[in-house]
Amino acid sequence: VQFARDNRILYQGRGSAANSVVCYCLEITAVDPRQINVLFERFISKERDEPPDIDVDFEHSRREEVIQYIYSKYGRERTALAATVISFRFKSAFREVGKALGFAESQLDYVIKNINRRDRTVPWQTQIENCGLSSANSKVKQLISLVEQIVGFPRHLSQHVGGFVISAKPLYELVPVENAAMSERTVIQWDKDDLETLGLLKVDVLALGMLTAIRKAFALLNEQYPQEVSIPFITRLGDDQQVYDMICEADTVGTFQIESRAQMTILPRLKPRCYYDLVVQIAIVRPGPIQGDMVHPYLLRRHGRESVSYPSEEVKSVLSRTMGVPIF
């Protein structure tokens, strides 16, 4: 983080780290948690069965600078990226088994394009017959059998999106390591779950394309205004009601987190007017609240069309900010 700050690389802490005053004081995050009334306990709770996890996003276009800084500071012997195990999915399994058995690539492509895996009423084993592969053929039988066996089986190792392991000792004394396909990178041959089981500390150095866009926007603004524009500067300005007027009209194309069609559909109905309203807005357009039928009750209560009630008085303090609806 200090390296990024010194080199004017935009970054931001994500997740529950934003609840931490310490992270704010260290400038890992830019929002004062006292201003937004978050739960400190979520980050430092004794009930957690693992150490606090701090994920940091860096500009997508400059993350490699941060990665190489970590390697140069700690050495490639003591620093490496975690691996991700890539497993066979149906298409890759079907294609590779088919090629090994001598089927033409054009035939395999045709079958893959015409199989509907979402159709649970017709098994894929039956669908391939409609594509000209008869299950009476011994080679087709072998193809079906082998595909069924290797779907879900590990295919190859890839690099984790940003999970770094930093050790006091050379990593090769603790875990198997290898050089990555990308130059100047080292990869541990185990995934993050294996590393957590061993108790090795993983630090996530993540990339976010929107931070690159924000930095470019700051550069344009700084050409026009004497006050240097930055994320901390903007967060100190507080809520801008003209911006919220645009948000309520779903004028949010290119706006991080609220630019999807689903978000833009809900924005005029929820009508966010402050930061916490946006927190609810982003959270409510997710599978959990949608499948749990929590969207409509919240909207009705927010606009006074339904009375606010609580399952129990014991949860009132927890659910009061979301009007009795368990969105989070």
Predicted regions and their residues:
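Alpha-helical scaffold/interaction cores of sigma-54-like transcription cofactors
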Residues: V1-I327
